Regions:
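Positively charged
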Residues: 1-163
Length: 163
């Protein structure tokens, strides 16, 4: 396993659509292992392959049970409700924004061996699924947020609100 560099906003790789994974082999396993190590080191809740420079449909999401899920060729197959919530991104460090996302989502994906499965999540897990899957289509949360806040602006705003 190896740490990979997390690509930052402005790199054209983050604006591209990713290709489906067609081979579930050692190369994929190495990528997933590297992404696991990179995400753990960065202390994030999710990481998509394009964030480490690989244009493949693979993401990691930490769910509400603090399990790190690997989703290969994921797709959202159902969703309900809507919540406005705060998001940040490892590719956009130091900035935050409020984004509307579904309150509940159900995903279909494959595991590292190519076995299909479904998973679902609410709240932050649903938000993470949506956020990471958007990366696979070249979209950042900054494209969806009404306003972007610096960490300092957000801290001041939350302090005013008593949070």
């Amino acid at each position: 396993m190896a740490l990979r560099e997390i690509i930052k906003k402005g790199d054209p790789v983050l604006e591209k659509h990713c290709h489906p994974v067609t081979r579930f082999d050692q190369k994929l396993w190495d990528l997933l292992d590297d992404m696991r190590e990179t995400l753990a080191q960065a202390n994030g809740l999710g990481l998509a392959a394009p964030q480490v420079g690989i244009l493949r449909r693979a993401v990691l999401v930490v769910n509400d049970q603090e399990e790190m899920l690997e989703l290969i060729n994921p797709e959202i197959i159902a969703s309900e409700g809507e919540e406005d919530g705060l998001e940040g991104c490892l590719s956009v460090p130091g900035y935050w924004g409020y984004v509307k996302r579904p309150a509940w989502v159900k995903d279909r994906a494959h595991d590292r061996n190519g076995n299909e499965f479904e998973t679902e999540g609410t709240g932050m897990t649903a938000r993470c699924f949506c956020h990471e899957l958007a990366h696979l289509d070249g979209q950042l949360y900054t494209d969806l947020a009404d306003r972007i806040y610096t960490t300092e602006e957000l801290d001041a705003m939350l302090e005013e609100q008593g949070k």
